[in-house]
Amino acid sequence: GACVTNALRQRGHRVLQIDPALLALHEIPHSTDVIYPMLHGTGGEDGTLQRDLDRLGIPWLGSSAEASALTFDKVVTREILAKAGLPIAPGFGLNPDSTREAIHTASLSIGYPQVVKPAAQGSSVGITIVDSEQDIDTAVAEAARWDGMVLIEKYIAGREVTVPVVNGEVFPVVEILPAARWYDYSAKYADDRTQY
């Protein structure tokens, strides 16, 4: 949020940066033109904030509350993409209370390496890249700490890119180059070696 705040200020906009942990939504000044949500994870990316802002009649930028809720749940997102005929990595959602044998059997069916993650979480929280069967139990337990459903997918090495789209206008592709193996929480928020 700080980078967006600074960029908007440099372009002459008056910006009030709000931490929802310190200021309730109903305390937002009535003179506010628009909210640009920059929150991650539960409450920020899952449609909750968007629904609350709609309820209060406060205009905001971003995807609808419904779209945010659907895409925050990675298992639901996989189902939507598959039904649309789009290619997705081999994988499956599972209840972390499944038997160890069931988890290992399903995991072996897609091969290694794998990405094990909470089905509904943001910012790469709770994600582990698993290179062998001996690490699957620990990875599932870590993901389950963050959500009641776990997603296991085949790890596909490649370039990480993001493509901003605003009001139907497609902006240039941005490649993300983390210093570590993948774009984890640290690379996103703490490691100044990440390049864009």
List each language-model region with its residue ranges:
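Active-site nucleotide/adenylate-binding loops and adjacent lid/helix of ATP-dependent enzymes
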Residues: 15-18, 30, 70-159
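Phosphate-binding site of ATP-dependent enzymes
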Residues: 131-196
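Glycine-rich phosphate/pyrophosphate-binding beta-alpha loops
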Residues: 41, 124, 179-182
